[in-house]
Amino acid sequence: MARIAGVDLPREKRVEIALTYIFGIGLSRSKQILRDTGVDPNKRVKDLTDDEVAKIRDYIDKNFKVEGELRAEIARNIKRLIDIRCYRGLRHLRGLPVRGQRTRTNARTRKGPRKTVGVMRKKS
């Protein structure tokens, strides 16, 4: 089983698709990695030689931030926005949409499920 950047790649999938299981590597970056390392993208992971796996692993380690390192950088960036109290940071802090979407309706993904507000009636 090929293990790259701390992720076990699925053995039966094509290398091109299997690399996308690594956080920070999508399909276009996967194609770029395989083109630059000279590995056939249509090969299955189980058919890769140890040299090819090592070549891919080294290329990813040298050129990209992936998995934990990338997650940590994203978290640091959000924390920095919150610390400097900019508009985007405040939106993150309040759990609201950051990129200008409407919030009067919708925005349920960021706001979570609705909180029902009850009405108190006078006893008569």
Curated annotation (Swiss-Prot):
GO BP of this protein: translation
Comp. bias intervals (Basic residues): 101-124
Keyword check for Chaperone: no
Start and end residues of each stretch annotated as Disordered: 99-124
SUPFAM superfamilies according to UniProt: S13-like H2TH domain
GO CC terms: cytosol; small ribosomal subunit
Organism: Caldicellulosiruptor bescii (strain ATCC BAA-1888 / DSM 6725 / KCTC 15123 / Z-1320) (Anaerocellum thermophilum)
Keywords for the protein's UniProt record, in alphabetical order: Ribonucleoprotein, Ribosomal protein, RNA-binding, rRNA-binding, tRNA-binding
NCBIfam families: uS13_bact (TIGR03631)
PROSITE patterns xref list: RIBOSOMAL_S13_1, RIBOSOMAL_S13_2
Taxonomic classification: Bacteria, Bacillati, Bacillota, Bacillota incertae sedis, Caldicellulosiruptorales
GO terms assigned for molecular function: rRNA binding; structural constituent of ribosome; tRNA binding
Keyword match rRNA-binding: yes
HAMAP family found in the cross-reference section: Ribosomal_uS13
Family: Belongs to the universal ribosomal protein uS13 family.
InterPro entries assigned: Rbsml_uS13_C, Ribosomal_uS13, Ribosomal_uS13-like_H2TH, Ribosomal_uS13_bac-type, Ribosomal_uS13_CS
This protein's name: Small ribosomal subunit protein uS13
